[in-house]
């Protein structure tokens, strides 16, 4: 569970946690709001408890929500099956139309990921055919 600004508290909303503000350090809601999150990670709102609201000096009204690390789409030259685990290594540094698959936000070099499913293929100018996978942590 965590706290999300009420205007963003809807199932499926995704966000990258950018870190806590200075005002968060002394806040009584800090443990449920920011303590469980890691800077630079992608999170998704899984459910919202509309009855639980709190006031925040930074974001205004906050709503209690179920928050989890979001699945991410990554490109790989390797052929993988559903359920396979692998260590993430960026496949390319080019600034092209597929960069969001090769260096997706929310994933860090060396992360252990698990394949949820294959989503399709892309044709990379540098590496050739790559597969796009939905992955979880």
Curated annotation (Swiss-Prot):
Pfam families in the cross-refs: UPF0179
Domain of life of the source: Archaea
Transmembrane segments: none
Similarity-based family: Belongs to the UPF0179 family.
UniProt-listed PANTHER family: UPF0179 PROTEIN MJ1627
Protein name: UPF0179 protein Kcr_1409
